């Protein structure tokens, strides 16, 4: 029973974390920047936000983004963080699907428990890799961006990435280390026996 609960907890935690990583990858509010001194920016109410795909300017009644489409002039850290976040988002999909197939409520024929166990271990390792890719990108990006401009604060995209990476790491570790062995995966099956058929009563007809 404990192993079953841990499997479900690992799946839910990993799924929520993967969604957070996708949100981080697709949005541009990674860091809030200031082109002048911080007091000047606050006085002018003019701040910027920087992400993987665009640089945005936020002013009173104005929000304008400039897409970062010229790969040749992009800083190396932006391209590397893009690759890491895309890899994390793509790798998370098969990991989540593998975890879905090893849940106790899912049964694929009469497969042995060791098959589910191996899929669970593979999915857990993949989720740990997803978490590591996201962690490296979400830590590396603000450090390098701070060298180019003044960072006022971190954006919601970065927080979503940190939370998502931690959740994927926790979920992957739970699946790999705590969700039971091959025997536990074999025992977590639910069988439903159909009720006994009602006896048929034959009626004899007298002519």
Curated annotation (Swiss-Prot):
The molecular function GO annotations come to:
structural molecule activity
List UniProt keywords, sorted A-Z. Cell junction, Cell membrane, Membrane, Phosphoprotein, Tight junction, Transmembrane, Transmembrane helix
- Extracellular face of the membrane: 23-82, 144-157
Q: Name one GO biological process term.
A: bicellular tight junction assembly
Membrane-topology annotation of the record: Multi-pass membrane protein
**For the modification Phosphoserine, which residues carry it?**
193-194, 197-198
Q: Which residues cross the membrane?
A: 2-22, 83-103, 123-143, 158-178
**Source organism superkingdom:** Eukaryota
**Gene3D superfamilies tied to this protein:** 1.20.140.150
Q: Name one Pfam family in it.
A: PMP22_Claudin
Q: Can you quote a single GO CC term?
A: plasma membrane
Q: Where in the cell is it found?
A: Cell junction, Tight junction; Cell membrane
Q: Which family does it belong to?
A: Belongs to the claudin family.
Q: What does this protein do?
A: Plays a major role in tight junction-specific obliteration of the intercellular space, through calcium-independent cell-adhesion activity.
The record's PANTHER family line, in alphabetical order, gives: CLAUDIN
What is the name listed in the Swiss-Prot or TrEMBL entry for this protein? Claudin-11
Where does this protein come from, organism-wise?
Bos taurus (Bovine)
Give the lineage.
Answer: Eukaryota, Metazoa, Chordata, Craniata, Vertebrata
């Amino acid at each position: 029973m404990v192993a079953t609960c841990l499997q479900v907890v690992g799946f839910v935690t990993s799924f929520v974390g993967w969604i957070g990583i996708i949100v981080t990858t697709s949005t541009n509010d990674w860091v809030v920047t200031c082109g002048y001194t911080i007091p000047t920016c606050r006085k002018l109410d003019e701040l910027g936000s920087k992400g993987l795909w665009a640089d945005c300017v936020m002013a009173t009644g104005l929000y304008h983004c400039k897409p970062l489409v010229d790969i040749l002039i992009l800083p190396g850290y932006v391209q590397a963080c893009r690759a890491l976040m895309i890899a994390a988002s793509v790798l998370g999909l098969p990991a989540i699907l593998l975890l879905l197939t090893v849940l106790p409520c899912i049964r694929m024929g009469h497969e042995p428990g060791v098959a589910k166990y191996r899929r669970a271990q593979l999915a857990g390792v993949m989720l740990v890799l997803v978490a590591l890719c996201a962690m490296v990108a979400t830590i590396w990006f603000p450090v390098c961006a701070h060298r180019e401009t003044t960072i006022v604060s971190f954006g919601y995209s970065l927080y979503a990435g940190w939370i998502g990476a931690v959740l994927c790491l926790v979920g992957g570790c739970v699946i790999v280390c705590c969700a039971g062995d091959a025997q536990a995966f074999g025992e977590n099956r639910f069988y439903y026996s159909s009720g006994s058929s009602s006896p048929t009563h034959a009626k004899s007809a007298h002519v």
